[in-house]
Swiss-Prot record:
Biased composition (Acidic residues): 59-74
Gene Ontology BP annotations: maturation of SSU-rRNA from tricistronic rRNA transcript (SSU-rRNA, 5.8S rRNA, LSU-rRNA)
A Pfam match: Utp25_C
UniProt record similarity statement: Belongs to the UTP25 family.
The organism's taxonomic lineage, starting at the top: Eukaryota, Fungi, Dikarya, Ascomycota, Taphrinomycotina
Official protein name in the record: U3 small nucleolar RNA-associated protein 25
Name of encoding gene: utp25
SUPFAM superfamilies per UniProt: P-loop containing nucleoside triphosphate hydrolases
Disordered: annotated span: 29-74
Function: DEAD-box RNA helicase-like protein required for pre-18S rRNA processing, specifically at sites A0, A1, and A2.
Organism: Schizosaccharomyces pombe (strain 972 / ATCC 24843) (Fission yeast)
Keywords: Nucleus, Ribonucleoprotein, Ribosome biogenesis, rRNA processing
């Protein structure tokens, strides 16, 4: 969050280094901004989204009024509970807590108070000075990154993990988990993942299968709950002690209550994740459960069994991508739809939270509830890329900033690294994705800056060329370009000057042109309009009727070329009839898309409209497409294809 300080002309860096001045500024400022002009309208074709927005707006006003009354009662009841517990055997309790703190990553990470080590580690991150290591792991390959400093935060106290008992979970969570899985066994994948996750390092797990994703989200739910329960227990215990002895001082808080942010692609994914949280929480009392079921589930599954398995996994249930809700935990209950400032966990879609945040310059902008997020989880990033990745970046730009208002904060209990605006370097970020791409990889580099280190887990990809099921000539053509900025022009020049010229010359029909970027799609479409080329087009913005018409014209041969965007395929997964050859303007982000596209001529062959040896596929790529290309051709080929002396590679 940008800060415009009036404190004696102090710069941003000076303000960040002076906690006392920062507090004065925070409590006394009255800043006004001129609104920026920015068109950020979000259009939705689903009526359910509009209905949910109206319902949520009305319900949020009602919940906010209820929360204000209930929150104070819950707090006082919990404090009294801990006063009673402390009074039973104070010495034993303090001794046990001290012992637990020395062994618990939660306390080692968030209670760390060596300001010099924190400062040096942050400087190393900002200057790009990182120690890197690569190791084989149960997940394939793990790449670790740490600040290149003499002394850094401890992060290895959970190095030996054999089962659920070794994760340092709160007893109520552990008991709830073992009721469902009495053995408490973890898979080798979960053990490897937990070593980094429960040590509060940043985690990026890519190339996740559907099975590994289910196992991974189970760990996410356990970790989120564990963090919330330990945070609340620490705060309430210390509040109880202060009520008995006001001279005691504790640094155990952030500015606001929410500590965990979870970003998910659909209401169904939120429905399943929140049910996991509830099942592990150790309570059967869930407020607003009926409303939650009504708004986040559906009565009957309508997805076609003919769709690919990964499509059915992602788009099952309620697929609405506009939602947000708070989740609050007390000793006895779980409250859904709690007001954000009284919540422990915020669960949202990027679109839903982005609309709540608003735009820079908005007069009534309220995002202070994001100031004290200590764990940020981005699940199924591959699906979020297909929505609007800019929402993710906007949200993370706003995380861990100085709040505009106090919100009842006791500043004497705020941790020093919050006051010094260092919270984003202490925050743990966890990122799960089915595959990697440039946007996701850039996010890992720029937004995951945990000074305890970060770990990237990825499989050794062997490619999908042997999964096609029939012989088809696949020609990969590397386009020479020395800068990523020049890539769009280079692709366009090659396509219009080489491929399109041949298509026009021979008047070949049944050509599917797959274009990953919508902006490239618009450019190619406009060019073909200018040249008077006969074509059909389907993008993510096409209406159902336009899609049906385009598919019919293409199949009947009344148009020779079909332009087709990656996002349209992600949301529709069409299997076109009449395809005789495939041209890929760039490698598909999802390797599974490559398999589906190259298989499309098989249908034409089976219908007797194409010879079995006549199917062709041509893929344009540059050296900057190495991440996507690796998933298609495999890690052993990608280096030579991107940097070798040859520019054309053919596979059969």
């Amino acid at each position: 969050m940008a800060i415009e300080s009036d404190l004696d002309g102090a710069s941003m860096d000076e303000l960040a280094g002076k906690s006392y001045e920062a507090l004065l500024y925070l409590m006394n400022k009255n800043k006004k901004r001129k609104p920026e002009k920015k068109d950020d309208k979000e259009k939705s074709s689903k009526k359910v989204q509009k209905k949910n927005k109206v319902i949520e707006s009305l319900n949020e006003m009602e919940v906010e009024m209820e929360d204000e009354n209930e929150n104070e009662n819950d707090e006082q009841e919990a404090i009294q509970y801990y006063i009673n517990v402390e009074s039973q055997d104070a010495d034993e309790t303090l001794h046990q807590e001290a012992q637990d703190s020395s062994e618990d990553p939660f306390h080692q990470h968030f209670d760390y108070d060596d300001s010099e080590v924190i400062k040096n580690s942050i400087a190393a991150y900002d200057e790009g000075k990182l120690c890197k290591s690569i190791e084989e792991s149960k997940l394939g390959v793990s790449q670790s990154f740490f600040p290149d400093v003499t002394k850094r935060l401890p992060c290895s106290c959970l190095s030996e993990i054999k089962n659920i008992d070794d994760l340092g979970l709160k007893q109520r969570i552990l008991d709830s988990y073992k009721k469902q899985k009495p053995s408490g066994q973890l898979t080798s994948m979960q053990i490897e993942l937990a070593k980094a996750m429960f040590n509060y390092q940043d985690v990026f797990f890519t190339n996740m299968s559907m099975k590994s994703h289910k196992l991974g989200t189970s760990l996410l739910a356990l970790h989120a709950l564990n963090h919330v329960f330990k945070t609340r227990d620490r705060v309430l215990k210390n509040s109880a002690r202060i009520s008995q002895n006001p001279e005691l001082e504790f640094r155990d808080q952030g500015y606001t209550r929410p500590k965990v942010l979870i970003l998910l692609p659909t209401r169904n994914s939120a429905f399943e994740f929140i049910n996991l949280l509830i099942s592990y929480s150790g309570t059967n009392q869930v407020e607003n459960r009926k409303r939650f079921d009504n708004e986040f589930s559906i009565e009957k599954e309508v997805i076609s069994e003919k769709k690919p398995e990964d499509f059915r996994y992602l788009f099952s249930g309620n697929t609405d991508d506009m939602f947000r809700l708070g989740v609050k935990f007390t000793r006895k209950t779980v409250k859904l739809f709690s007001q954000f400032y009284n919540s422990d966990i915020i669960v949202a879609s990027p679109l839903g939270l982005r609309l709540a945040i608003g735009n820079k310059g908005d007069k009534k902008r309220d995002l202070d509830y994001l100031s004290s997020i200590e764990i940020a989880m981005v699940d199924q990033a591959h699906a979020l890329v297909m929505q609007n990745w800019e929402h993710i970046e906007c949200i993370f730009d706003e995380l861990n900033g100085l709040p505009k208002e106090a919100h009842g904060c006791d500043f004497s209990r705020v941790r020093p690294w919050y006051l010094d605006q260092q919270a984003r370097y202490m925050r743990q970020t966890i990122l799960f994705s089915q595959y990697n791409n440039l946007d996701i990889n850039s996010f890992f580099s720029h937004y995951m800056s945990n000074i305890a280190g970060k770990v990237k887990f990825r499989s050794l990809l062997h490619g999908v060329l042997n999964r096609l099921g029939y012989k088809v000539t696949q020609t990969f053509v590397r386009i020479s370009v020395d800068s990523i900025i020049k890539v769009p022009d280079a692709r366009f020049s090659y396509f219009t000057g080489s491929i399109l010229v041949q298509l026009k010359k021979y008047s070949q029909s049944g050509i599917l042109v797959y274009i990953p970027s919508y902006f490239d799609f618009v450019r190619v479409r406009n060019y073909m309009d200018e040249e008077g080329i006969n074509y059909s087009a389907i993008s993510e913005y096409s209406s159902v009727s336009d899609m049906t018409r385009a598919r019919n014209l293409f199949y009947q041969g009344r148009t020779n070329i079909m332009l087709y965007t990656e996002r349209a395929h992600h949301f529709r997964r069409f299997d076109f009839r009449g395809v005789k050859a495939v041209v890929m303007y760039g490698p598909p982000t999802n390797p599974q898309f490559y398999v589906e596209l190259v298989r499309m001529p098989m249908r034409t062959i089976s219908e007797g409209n194409l010879d079995s040896d006549a199917a062709k596929c041509r893929i344009m790529y540059t050296k900057f497409d190495s991440i996507c290309l690796e998933g298609i051709v495999g890690y052993q080929r990608v280096s030579n294809m991107c940097h070798g002396k040859h520019e054309v590679f053919e596979f059969l």
